[in-house]
Amino acid sequence: MSNEYFDPKLKIFSLNSNRELAEEIAKEVGIELGKSSVTHFSDGEIQINIEESIRGCHVYVIQSTSNPVNQNLMELLIMIDALKRASAATINIVMPYYGYARQDRKARSREPITAKLVANLIETAGATRMITLDMHAPQIQGFFDIPIDHLNAVRLLSDYFSERHLGDDLVVVSPDHGGVTRARKMADRLKAPIAIIDKRRPRPNVAEVMNIVGNVEGKVCIIIDDIIDTAGTITLAAKALREAGATKVYACCSHPVLSGPAMKRIEESPIEKLVVTNSIALPEEKWIDKMEQLSVAALLGEAIVRVHENASVSSLFE
């Protein structure tokens, strides 16, 4: 992309979830971030002011609904309403991390489908398009009646490992059956076979590794997942792979939620390196030496430009 974008009708705004990523995206596109402010009334209510005219403009709002999830979601909904009332031509939400995505179905009776509720709220507020990255459940796209561009970070993560020249004995590992499609995409790019961890989860945030489907003995394993939350799944998988004869274990994910005991578990695990993206802003206390972060700014910036110019974005899905 060029260093400067000349269409004055294109505007990019950032809320509070990931300002640093938003600045990187704006730089990739070649424009300055729009002027807005997010403040709070004395009772905690959110107040948003858009400090420039956006009448007739095509606006892109960068906001992940990561921790604090409800605060960030409410900021987004209020911002959408403000943009709609200020006569924006289109309101495009760029949500690198879609919170509540793991509540995509009724796992038990009398449970909500919160991922659908969030989609309803975003649409009802006035959004006209969504751009997002590696949703936990791809079928969430069907919860929206507006266009949604669902990008993935597989190419970015694959290129990282390809450039490290880890040898010919690579195996890409899915930590569960649900991640096989993602693992296969990476395996195809790295020209490597795949293995699958067969696990059972007795209760939320507790994972038990049961079996390894595939040959990992004498291999360098790369575990790929969409979200690492408490890191129970990924660290138990790494331990199981080493016990099965893997020589080294690397791990990567699109969304480093990293809650509770995650950092301690990763630090004490046999994982050589954990590679994550910056879809979620990480505070200093969530950094350890064996972590490395890759930026999705170029991918999201390219998507914004292509959408704005009515160009195809299909090559970004590959």
UniProtKB/Swiss-Prot annotation:
Q: Which domain of life does the UniProt lineage start with?
A: Bacteria
> Any one cellular component term from GO for this entry?
ribose phosphate diphosphokinase complex
Q: Name the InterPro entries for this protein.
A: PRib_PP_synth_CS, Pribosyltran_N, PRibTrfase_dom, PRTase-like, Rib-P_diPkinase, Rib-P_diPkinase_bac
Q: Which UniProt keywords apply?
A: ATP-binding, Cytoplasm, Kinase, Magnesium, Metal-binding, Nucleotide biosynthesis, Nucleotide-binding, Transferase
Q: Where does D-ribose 5-phosphate bind?
A: R201, D225, D229, T230, A231, G232, T233
Entry's Gene Ontology BP terms: 5-phosphoribose 1-diphosphate biosynthetic process; purine nucleotide biosynthetic process; ribonucleoside monophosphate biosynthetic process
User: What's noted on cofactor binding?
Assistant: Binds 2 Mg(2+) ions per subunit.
Which cofactor names does the annotation list? Mg(2+)
* Keyword match Oxidoreductase: no
Instruction: State the family it belongs to.
Output: Belongs to the ribose-phosphate pyrophosphokinase family. Class I subfamily.
Q: Which PANTHER family match?
A: RIBOSE-PHOSPHATE DIPHOSPHOKINASE FAMILY MEMBER, RIBOSE-PHOSPHATE PYROPHOSPHOKINASE 1, CHLOROPLASTIC
This protein's name: Ribose-phosphate pyrophosphokinase 1
What is the native source organism of this protein? Listeria monocytogenes serovar 1/2a (strain ATCC BAA-679 / EGD-e)
User: Could you tell me the gene encoding this protein?
Assistant: prs1
